[in-house]
Structure formats: C-alpha cells, structure tokens
Amino acid sequence: MESSVKPNPFLSFSSFIHHQCTRFSSDLSARIEDTKRFAETLATRRFSLPTPPPFASVSQSKSGTPTTTLSPSLVAKALAGTSVFTVSNTNNEFVLISDPTGGKSIGLLCFRQEDAEAFLAQARLRRRELKTNAKVVPITLDQVYLLKVEGISFRFLPDPIQIKNALELKSSGNKNGFDGVPVFQSELLVVRKKNRRYCPVYFSKEDIERELSKYTRASRGDQQIMVGSLEDVLRKMEMSEKNSGWEDVIFIPPGRSYAQHMQDLIKE
C-alpha cells in the first residue's frame, strides 16, 4: 500500500470527454461507405519500425527546470497485448487507402476483425492483384504506436457497439457523436500492489462492468464508469511527467480481465 495517494488523471474529465461531433458513426454501414469513398486508389507500403514514436512527446518544464516526460517505450508498454486488424499483402505490406482530396495514404486499423474483412472485400474489388494475395492480419497497438511510415497516417475504426456505449454514458445534451476510440475507466478498479499503482483502462464497457461486478458491491448506478478516447489518453500520457499518475495507466484488451491480462504479460 502506498503511503501517499497519487492523483487519478481520469478524474479531470471536463477535458477528457469530447463534446464535438465525430467522423466515426455508430452506424457501421456509414463507416464502410466512408471507406469506399477513400478506396478509389489503393497503395502499399512496408512495415517499418522506427526509433521515434509517431506521437511526439511534448517536454514540459517548471520554473525553467527541464522535466522528464513519459518515454515512448513506457507509453507503448501500456498498450501491449491489444490487437487491431488491418489488411496486408503476401509481402507483409500494408494495403492503404488514398484520400481523393490529394492528402495522405491512410492505413485502416479495425478493432473488429469483421470490419477489416469488409475493407478487404472492398480492396479486392478495386485491385485485381489483391484478390488472391491480400489478407486480414492482426497487429498490436504497441507495434502501431512505435511504427513510423513516412507520409502515412492511421485511422482507427472503433467497435460501433462501444461507440454506442460511450454515447450512452455521455450527458444527455451531448450525444451527437463521439470522437475517437472509446475507452472506459473506474476509480473503483484502481489496483495498488506493493509499491506500484495500476489504473486499468478498458476498450469494452461490458468488460469493465464485469470487473466491477466481481470486485465491488456497487450497484449499476454507482459504478462510476468514466469514458474518454484512446487518442486523448495517449496525448496526455505523452505530455505528462513521471509520477503524474499517467504512467499507471494499463490498457486491458477486449474480452480480457485485468488479472488475465497481467498473467498474459508475465508469460511473454
């Protein structure tokens, strides 16, 4: 048990909850139509593991004294074990969609395998050579975080069920949309073990509800589930100093409990 209590970064949720409309719709058909529009031109690029992360760490200072932000490897470690799905060819190259507005080549990363399969079907319609040599492959979020491909940006396609869950948790006046990949957290599930503190963050509302039912006696109305976006959490981790509380975040893969995930990490 720690002698001093660290601040829980998730309690400052006025900035954590997004209040603007989103490009991600809970209607899967609309999201697939959006993918079709981008898929007029397809390109391929190889996987590349870089030294710097795709999300730049922002240094902060107090009274002119440099401070240390969380390292890219520490942020990536928090993402270990969670897989997303994309489409690659037999050479292990991303199949990309090109923005017809003249922008970037975009790698699509799906939280559901079935969404990646739908993207693959569209890619095969657009390019003949992909009919036999393209496939859906998993890639872990820590690999995505450390991946640097020049000129390519990634777009996440969240689970539409979790978009719906996130909107239900938002205030009634702000349900027009949700920006980003929903993640869920509860102060009731923060774990303190020896000299460490762990703040589990879930990609599935059903998973966090299951955990709360096991470890707390709180009724459904008192479970204190908070919702934010993966992208926002990563930005805050990158900008935060050590011992700020953000280094305690650990992402729990969909379908896994905190205990199962920790066991998986020990085995690796």
Curated annotation (Swiss-Prot):
Key words, A-Z: Chloroplast, Membrane, Plastid, Protein transport, Transit peptide, Transport
Localization per record: Plastid, Chloroplast intermembrane space
UniProt main location, coarse: plastid
Transit peptide feature, positions: 1-59
BP terms from Gene Ontology: protein transport
Coiled coil ranges: none
Its membrane topology: Peripheral membrane protein
Domain of life (superkingdom): Eukaryota
Cellular-component GO terms for this entry: chloroplast; chloroplast envelope; chloroplast intermembrane space; plasma membrane; plastid
InterPro entries (alphabetical): Tic22 (IPR005692), Tic22-like (IPR007378)
Quaternary organization: Part of the Tic complex. Interacts with OEP61 during its transport into the intermembrane space.
Function: Involved in protein precursor import into chloroplasts. Imported into the intermembrane space via the Toc translocon. May be involved in the import pathway used by proteins without a cleavable N-terminal pre-sequence.
Family: Belongs to the Tic22 family.
Name of the molecule in the record: Protein TIC 22, chloroplastic
Organism of this sequence: Arabidopsis thaliana (Mouse-ear cress)
Species lineage: Eukaryota, Viridiplantae, Streptophyta, Embryophyta, Tracheophyta
Gene field: TIC22
